[in-house]
């Protein structure tokens, strides 16, 4: 099903990064009080010249969805191992490496998706050219994918909500 969605805006992503970083700051010191182990490194890594170069190489390698390009213009990667069972948005260099090794993910009847993220349970997240985000049903690259969010923005908002729920 192709549903037209508004494309991701870099200013919105920048604002989202600031909100997430601010939400993580008070959460991590209290983590040890509610868990039997210390927190991992929960961080939003902003884009650098190096990650911009890796994004350019990824664009040359595959028809990368525009929302993923926008995302990588602002961030390099995100590591949230202590939010639920963990959420990880991979760096553009890692996405390119995985694309070379595994190719595109077949997601429903849409164009193939580019895997850009995973969770701590091994599930993969792929974005199709429509901007829709898909989640693998198992911890396998070539298994079925189901809809996770209608857009990259909704996917990021879901992560924000999970952080808020954990506070």
What are these regions (language model features)?
Residues 1, 133, 159-162:
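Conserved short hydrophobic patches within well-ordered secondary structure
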Residues 1-124:
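A surface-exposed partner-binding patch
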Residues 95-97, 122-126, 140-148:
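Short, surface-exposed beta-strand/loop "edge" segments at domain boundaries and coil↔beta transitions
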Residues 113-119, 160-167:
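Short secondary-structure transition/capping segments
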Residues 127-131:
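Short acidic-glycine loop/turn motifs at beta-strand connectors
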Residues 132-140:
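Intrinsically disordered, low-complexity regulatory segments enriched in Ser/Thr/Pro
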Residues 140-166:
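Compact, glycine/acidic-enriched structural inserts
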């Amino acid at each position: 099903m192709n549903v037209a969605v508004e494309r991701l805006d870099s200013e919105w992503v920048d604002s989202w990064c600031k909100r997430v970083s601010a939400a993580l700051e008070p959460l991590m010191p209290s983590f040890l009080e509610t868990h039997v182990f210390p927190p991992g490194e929960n961080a939003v890594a902003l884009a650098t010249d190096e990650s911009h170069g890796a994004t350019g190489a990824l664009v040359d390698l595959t028809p990368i969805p525009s929302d993923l390009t926008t995302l990588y213009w602002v961030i390099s990667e995100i590591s949230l191992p202590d939010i639920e069972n963990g959420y990880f948005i991979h760096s553009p260099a890692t996405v390119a490496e995985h694309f070379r090794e595994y190719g595109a993910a077949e997601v429903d009847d849409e164009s193939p998706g580019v895997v850009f993220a995973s969770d701590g349970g091994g599930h993969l997240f792929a974005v199709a050219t429509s901007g829709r985000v898909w989640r693998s049903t198992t911890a396998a690259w070539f298994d079925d994918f189901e809809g996770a969010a209608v857009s990259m923005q909704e996917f990021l908002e879901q992560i924000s909500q999970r952080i808020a729920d954990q506070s």
